[in-house]
Design a protein with these regions (language model features):
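Glutamate identity and glutamate-enriched acidic tracts
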Residues: 11, 16, 32, 38, ...
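Catalytic micro-motifs at enzyme active sites that drive phosphoryl/nucleotidyl and oxygen chemistry
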Residues: 51-52, 61, 109-113
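Beta-rich catalytic cores
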Residues: 58
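Conserved catalytic cores of phosphodiester-cleaving nucleases, focusing on short active-site segments
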Residues: 62-64, 69-77, 99
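Catalytic cores of nucleic-acid endonucleases
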Residues: 78-132
Length: 141
């Protein structure tokens, strides 16, 4: 499937993709990392529009390429312990699965999803009560 993407809407940074603006009176960036990343929510939106899906599938927040790996990053502005409550882990697994399929479409990946999965890491960034200024990212190393 060959989709033309609007790269100007996809190109971003890890900082910008980590934003939690659900409360406009308290906008939080989970990381301050200026490294280039791709807005995976936007990629998902563009794929859904092109293949005429009735809804946008679940997607991770960012795609960061590091060496031979594709890093799908999900930012969660909550404590790690909260990720184990209720359906949070199930939703995270579903989001990772949907994102892997979308990544294959985005990359026009010709091998199996199993091979792509071996080249992909899921990174979950959470906030255990520290301010955004204390959050760090070591994915770039």
């Amino acid at each position: 499937m060959n989709i033309q993407y609007d790269k100007s809407k996809i190109e971003s940074t890890l900082k910008e993709t980590s934003i939690d603006d659900s409360d406009l009176s308290n906008v939080v960036y989970l990381v301050e990392d200026p490294h280039t990343a791709e807005n995976f929510d936007e990629i998902s939106k563009q794929i859904a529009a092109k293949v005429r899906m009735g809804h946008k599938p679940r997607s991770c927040d960012a795609l960061y390429r590091s060496g031979k790996y594709y890093n799908l990053i999900e930012f969660k502005n909550r404590k790690s312990a909260d990720l184990r409550i209720g359906n949070e882990m199930v939703e995270l697994h579903e989001k990772a699965f949907d994102s892997l399929g979308q990544l294959a479409i985005y990359l026009n990946y010709q091998n199996s999803l199993d091979n792509l999965a071996k080249e992909t890491r899921l990174v979950v960034v959470y906030n255990d009560g520290k301010g955004a200024e204390e959050a760090t990212s070591d994915i770039a190393s």
